[in-house]
């Protein structure tokens, strides 16, 4: 079974309406051998609002404590696999295909009997199956509807929570707050473990009546856990303080709003019940818990906020948080489903000066004209109808001044479509043969007949992206009319689905395509603008004075002032030796010197902030007058800050912004920052992560890390991406990353390849000098494949290698 067949089979199950009860899920799991029975500890989180954020907070805290954690949430933004993650990585396509192939006979048989499991039941079973396979320590489950009859209640939780209760799904859960609260309280764990809840008044009384023992969370006196919102500390974070009987945490969270402090308090209480985590893990976990589309601030000047508020209560919470910002005008983009109380939602939101009513793709979306009438009745200033969410967002941002605030709300579906403005990538693929064309098409899950038919037409410029199904169809029609080609994933039968599209054309055809997309519906104008920028059509590349700009590949020399680095540990830990090495690098043509005070080799000991500063600061101060840029290789924001103060120019973070403060340091000092993809740092030699396609998967995972830096205020041109050769990749995967380095330009910034003396070169049986010869060869290949920077230990031979590659590409000066 191919992935597109498996995904279509799964998504087709949405034709079966939801049904309450756990029996169908239990039967499906029984057909798989009940993988959940001997699985991890389960944490089950129910609630009308806040359950997804609380689940993400809980997962992040437990991971910060060193546990392997599965997370099951809904809905997804772009890909159904987002619902099932292990240690932050979504389920692989191969795993999903294996699961669907396994259950297909069972589901088909049950469907023939008129008792097919529903989409949500199957995805829930898939999550539990995946968590068992991955042998996670804890699985955090977000409840779908209610608690008593939800598919997730097939497990016996060791800890659980009810975040909040509002009137919702009254046809299933009951018509009053107490009835709904009692239903949700059925997630309570067995035994003496109290159910954690932030409910109040009648809801709390009903929860207590059913669950018995409860642990209450809130910001009022008498709560077992006090969670206090201290207000924003910057445009993306807020301070919170959380206090229990014998513990207390003060930290920042990346989700704004008073209600998020309560969610954080619930998560902290759950994590302590589940694993006895310490205060430091709670603080680090909460600050690292990024959750797209939940009052997500995409940047400043103007402030742009995405929030999936989809009912009056959630809209009221958004209004309270928006009130924390100073702004001149409020520009709102609103799209909602037809079964929501639009009047109450509009009344709960702050009154906009200008609102754009729009229609997300799903069939359930309310007509934009209806929403426009609702906001006219609610007293909005100017009311416009722009049906495509992407176009509405573009119009709002275009109208906004630096002092305005743009708010996108009404539905997570609307937010998902809006978010593509920041997450869409166009990956260019080198296609020099029929085999290259076939591989590019197969990676996008084009059907085998389509691959056979189209491969001969792809031996030229090939660009892959993800777009809505209706956008893909339009791209296909327009490119065909221009003489180009466009193949779309076989996963194309679902209304509103995001699908891979591979466009094949000459640059002239791409130029005409962008012109034809301008002014078209469905957000295609924005797709065209992004494509034009990505391909550099009619745009001279911007320059900022960095040595990696233009056709030139810069060489970054590694200067480890450590006793235990994997290649040169101990050689330059004496100050004078380090200075002499730096001077030699500069004489031999290095562009950047990267100074590291902590090793990331397997088994390396952690280094304190003080010790790392003692190692790197004296070196930076002594060599700051060299005519090269200085970089500091560190995982710690405080080391980064002091290094920049001492004269460093660039930050190099091998953890990909694991320290939540790192991105803000880079923004504050206007410093370029290297964001690396790493599974573990230091390297764990036993780590063997699954990749469907290592390049596509690393780009997808780096997209969110790059976006974190951008939201903090670091522009894309200063975010250098490093695919992380050797960090959670096999030798074969390392060579694949090297060969396709140019595809990482899809992320919008320079690309760094760090391959120096890596063990991957042992796979070609040419390691006579611990990989030095192989490193120089790979540097030439990296430069030829589009790398902007190569990071190496040995400067002279690698400078020569990249300059030869440069001369081959651009020509040599006859002088």
Swiss-Prot record:
Binding residue positions for ATP: 47-53
The keyword Cell division belongs to this UniProt entry's keyword annotation: no
Annotated binding of Mg(2+), by residue: 560
UniProt xrefs under InterPro entries: DHP_synth-like (IPR045031), DHP_synth_dom (IPR006390), Dihydropteroate_synth-like_sf (IPR011005), Folylpolyglutamate_synth (IPR001645), Folylpolyglutamate_synth_CS (IPR018109), Mur-like_cat_sf (IPR036565), Mur_ligase_C (IPR004101), Mur_ligase_C_dom_sf (IPR036615)
Catalytic activity: (6S)-5,6,7,8-tetrahydrofolyl-(gamma-L-Glu)(n) + L-glutamate + ATP = (6S)-5,6,7,8-tetrahydrofolyl-(gamma-L-Glu)(n+1) + ADP + phosphate + H(+); (7,8-dihydropterin-6-yl)methyl diphosphate + 4-aminobenzoate = 7,8-dihydropteroate + diphosphate
Pfam family, one: Mur_ligase_C
GO biological process per UniProt: folic acid biosynthetic process; tetrahydrofolate biosynthetic process
E.C. code: 6.3.2.17, 2.5.1.15
Stretch list, region DHPS: 555-815
Protein's job: Can complement an H.volcanii mutant strain that is thymidine auxotroph because it lacks the two dihydrofolate reductase genes encoded by hdrA and hdrB.
Family: In the N-terminal section; belongs to the folylpolyglutamate synthase family. In the C-terminal section; belongs to the DHPS family.
NCBIfam families named among the record's database cross-references: DHPS, folC
This protein's name: Probable bifunctional folylpolyglutamate synthase/dihydropteroate synthase
Name of the gene this protein is made from: folP
């Amino acid at each position: 079974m191919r992935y597109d067949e498996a995904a279509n089979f799964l998504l087709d199950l949405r034709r079966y309406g939801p049904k309450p009860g756990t029996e169908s899920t239990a039967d499906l799991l029984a057909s798989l051998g009940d993988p959940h029975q001997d699985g991890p500890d389960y944490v089950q989180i129910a609630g009308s609002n806040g359950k997804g954020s609380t689940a993400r907070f809980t997962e992040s805290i437990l991971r910060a404590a060193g546990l392997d954690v599965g997370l099951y949430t809904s809905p997804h933004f772009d890909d159904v696999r987002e619902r099932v993650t292990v240690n932050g990585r979504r389920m692989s396509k191969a795993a999903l295909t294996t699961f669907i192939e396994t259950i297909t006979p069972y589901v088909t048989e049950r469907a023939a009997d008129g008792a097919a499991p529903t989409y949500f039941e199957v995805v829930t079973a898939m999550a539990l199956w995946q968590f068992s396979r991955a042998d996670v320590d804890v699985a955090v489950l977000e409840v779908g509807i209610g608690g008593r009859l939800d598919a997730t209640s097939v497990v016996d939780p060791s800890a659980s929570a009810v975040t909040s209760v509002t009137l919702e799904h009254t046809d299933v859960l009951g018509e009053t707050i107490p009835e709904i609260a009692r239903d949700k309280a059925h997630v309570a764990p067995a035994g003496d473990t109290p159910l954690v809840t932030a409910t109040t008044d009648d809801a709390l009384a009903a929860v207590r009546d059913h669950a018995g023992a409860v642990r209450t969370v809130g910001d009022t006196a008498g709560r077992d856990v006090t969670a206090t919102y201290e207000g924003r500390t910057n445009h993306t974070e807020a301070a919170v303080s959380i206090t229990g009987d014998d513990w207390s945490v003060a930290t920042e969270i990346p989700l704004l709003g008073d209600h998020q402090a309560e969610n954080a308090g619930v998560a902290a209480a759950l994590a302590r019940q589940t694993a006895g985590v310490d205060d430091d893990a709670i603080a680090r976990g909460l600050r690292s818990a990024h959750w797209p589309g939940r009052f997500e601030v995409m940047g400043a000047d103007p402030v742009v906020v995405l929030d999936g508020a989809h009912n009056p209560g959630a809209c009221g919470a958004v209004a309270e948080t928006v009130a924390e910002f100073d702004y001149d005008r409020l520009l709102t983009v609103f799209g909602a489903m037809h079964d929501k109380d639009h009047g109450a939602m509009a009344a709960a939101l702050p009154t906009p000066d200008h609102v754009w009513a729009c229609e997300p793709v799903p069939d359930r979306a309310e007509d934009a004209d209806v929403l426009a009438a609702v906001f006219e009745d609610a007293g909005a200033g100017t009311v416009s109808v722009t049906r495509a969410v992407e176009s509405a967002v573009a119009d709002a941002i275009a109208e906004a001044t630096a002092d305005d605030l743009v708010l996108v709300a009404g539905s997570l579906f609307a937010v998902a479509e809006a978010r593509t403005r920041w997450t869409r990538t166009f990956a260019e693929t080198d296609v020099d043969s029929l085999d290259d064309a076939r591989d590019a098409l197969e990676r996008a899950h084009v059907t085998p007949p389509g691959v056979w038919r189209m491969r001969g037409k792809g031996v030229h410029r090939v660009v892959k992206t993800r777009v809505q199904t209706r956008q893909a169809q339009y791209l296909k029609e327009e490119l065909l009319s221009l003489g180009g080609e466009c193949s779309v994933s076989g996963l194309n039968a679902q209304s509103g689905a995001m699908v891979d599209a591979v466009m094949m054309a000459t640059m002239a055809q791409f130029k005409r395509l962008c012109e034809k997309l301008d002014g078209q519906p469905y957000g295609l104008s924005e797709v065209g603008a992004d494509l034009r920028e990505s391909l550099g059509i009619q745009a001279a590349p911007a320059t900022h004075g960095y040595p990696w700009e233009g056709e030139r590949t810069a060489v970054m020399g590694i200067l480890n002032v450590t006793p235990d680095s994997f290649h040169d540990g101990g050689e330059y830990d004496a100050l004078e030796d380090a200075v002499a090495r730096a001077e030699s690098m500069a004489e031999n043509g290095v562009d950047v010197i990267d100074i590291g005070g902590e090793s990331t080799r397997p088994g390396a000991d952690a280094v304190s902030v003080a010790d790392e500063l003692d190692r790197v600061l004296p070196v930076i101060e002594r060599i700051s007058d060299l005519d090269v840029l200085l970089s500091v290789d560190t995982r710690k924001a405080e080391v980064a800050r002091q290094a920049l103060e001492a004269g460093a120019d660039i930050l190099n973070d091998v953890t990909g912004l694991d320290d939540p403060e790192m991105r803000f340091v880079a923004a504050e000092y206007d410093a370029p920052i290297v964001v690396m993809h790493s599974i573990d740092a230091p390297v764990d030699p036993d780590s063997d992560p699954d990749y469907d396609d290592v390049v596509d998967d690393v780009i997808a995972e780096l997209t969110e890390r790059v976006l974190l830096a951008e939201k903090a205020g670091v522009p894309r041109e200063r975010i250098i991406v490093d695919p992380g050769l050797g960090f959670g990749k096999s030798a074969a995967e390392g060579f694949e990353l090297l060969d396709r380095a140019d595809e990482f330009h899809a992320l919008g910034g320079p690309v760094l390849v760090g391959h120096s003396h890596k063990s991957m070169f042992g796979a070609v049986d040419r390691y006579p000098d611990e990989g030095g010869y192989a490193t120089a060869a790979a540097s030439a290949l990296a430069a030829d494949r589009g790398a902007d920077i190569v990071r190496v230990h040995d400067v002279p031979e690698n400078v020569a290698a990249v300059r030869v590659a440069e001369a081959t590409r651009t020509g040599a000066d006859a002088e």
